[in-house]
Amino acid sequence: MALNLGKSVVDFLTAHPEEKFSARQIAEWLVATFPAECSAKKASSQTLETDADLLQQLVAEIGSQRPRLQKKHANLKTTEGRPRKYYVSEKSDIAEVAAAENVGVVAPVGKDEAKLGEHGLYPLLSSYLWAEFGVYSKRIDEKRSSNKRGPNGNRWLYPDLVGMEDLGADWHQEVKDCVNQYSDKRTKLWSFEVKLLINRSNVRECFFQSVSNSSWSNFGYLVAAEIEGQDTLKELRMLFAAHGIGLIKLDVENPSESQVLIPARERGEIDWDTANRLATENKDFLEYVKLVKQFYQTGEARPADWDVPKTED
């Protein structure tokens, strides 16, 4: 009997509701569950010479059948990013966001699993930014704000993380000194809004929150541990074209494998009026400004002053 791949995939995911699987994981299950059908598929093909070839073919077919399967099964959903994950959920988009915010996202710890809330994502993002871009990051805690303007006066004002990129980290000392004398820029300032889950129900709210609290910087990013649905990513690309806020998919299992799905559009100048508002209202942001000033004064950034992951000597 020939392998009914589409039905088998849906049956497998339905038997494991809310659990997310990559196409490769599903393909491995197919090979283990339907050995005779998979062997027949391999034998009937002139191109599938090895088991690895068969597995890769199943992965490709799962991906190619995804649009058709999602049209037929409304509860079949996918995440965006690498690798794409497949899952079945009866929850609405709004309910999925609420569940993520209440429970968190799954991150493996050894063989066990732990649930990460939004605050648990910050050190993972800091680690990625440092390893990938050499960006010194700093957490901005909105609880350290004055709130002089009332309960909603500072709504969407503060980013979750801010960062400083040392443009001359690899420059010769003479070049650094020359730039200082020339009074040219030595840094790019970054700003980040972090979310556990972005889907169709909250994509515009999340994006415009990022526009509101990160447009002061050279590079503003919306960061998400999970992005559900191709329509969500399409919407974000459309919004980027108008506003320039980028998108980072944060890999909670392996932060170094996180991806910039949409590069932010650089702003040539800092919006110092907004930066002043942030520094006036929030002690963490004021400390960030002081650290940037200190860097320009000394030419050095001390990792101990920033949320930079410690390295072993």
Model-derived features with residue positions:
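Phospho-regulated, low-complexity intrinsically disordered regions of nuclear gene-regulatory
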Residues: 1-15, 33-117
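Flexible coil/turn residues that form the inter-helical turn or adjacent wing/linker of helix-turn-helix
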Residues: 19
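A short acidic, leucine-rich amphipathic alpha-helix
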Residues: 25-27
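Acidic-basic catalytic patches of nuclease active cores, encompassing PD-(D/E)XK
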Residues: 104-172
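Conserved catalytic cores of phosphodiester-cleaving nucleases, focusing on short active-site segments
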Residues: 125, 161-173, 183-199
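Non-catalytic C-terminal interaction segments of nucleic acid-processing enzymes
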Residues: 179-182, 237-313
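Nucleic-acid nuclease catalytic cores
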Residues: 198-203, 216-254
